[in-house]
Amino acid sequence: MNKAMAITAFKRPEYLTEVLTSLKETSPSDFTLFIGAEPVSADVIKICKSIDFLPTILTINSKVLGVRENPFQTMKRAFDAGFDLVWQLEDDVVLSPDAAALVDAFAKFDRRDEYLCLNLYNPSSWGDEETVYASKGFNALSLAITRSQWDKFFIPNYHSDKRGWDWSMIGLLQRTHLTNLTPALSRSHHIGRAGGTHYRPDQHDHMYVNNPWKQDKSISEFKFKP
């Protein structure tokens, strides 16, 4: 399976640096990295151009696309280039050391296309490091999406809710039998406390600071229990 990553980058170089450091520590193999950078920060673009641990295709947008369209266009470029799976990530979401191992396990799971996608973030983490289960929840804090899922679920529904693409996918889950695959213990964590689009620092702290996520360097033996 040909695998790509799709990262969006805006104007917070300090967060982007943390995200890329965490990504490198997952030891991703056989991924090509697609980046959609908004044309607003020379420091962010410099960081993107300096990436040397994965093959990287950088697109500097001709105008600011925003939090809905930049992820869509970046993922679309990866699928249009022929990749079978795209791992989506934003510039203020850090990863657990075994996050790439989880994505690889998802790629090998023979029933993966029965689900909307793999959601690496779990706001209700309960501590089991190995279990991956079916959930009706959805968030955009790192996803893995196959070509089949992209064509069947994301393309027809991504722009259906004006509030945002996460609301579009939440609505799809609510009105259908579909579920997500998600780890019992979150494999991503939101660090975008300041300078973002959606949250004030106090809102961010309330929603994210105390949510458990896997931080030790052990690699789990993932067990899919949908």
Briefly describe each language-model feature range.
Residues 1-89, 93-226:
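Peripheral/terminal regions associated with large enzymatic or DNA-binding modules
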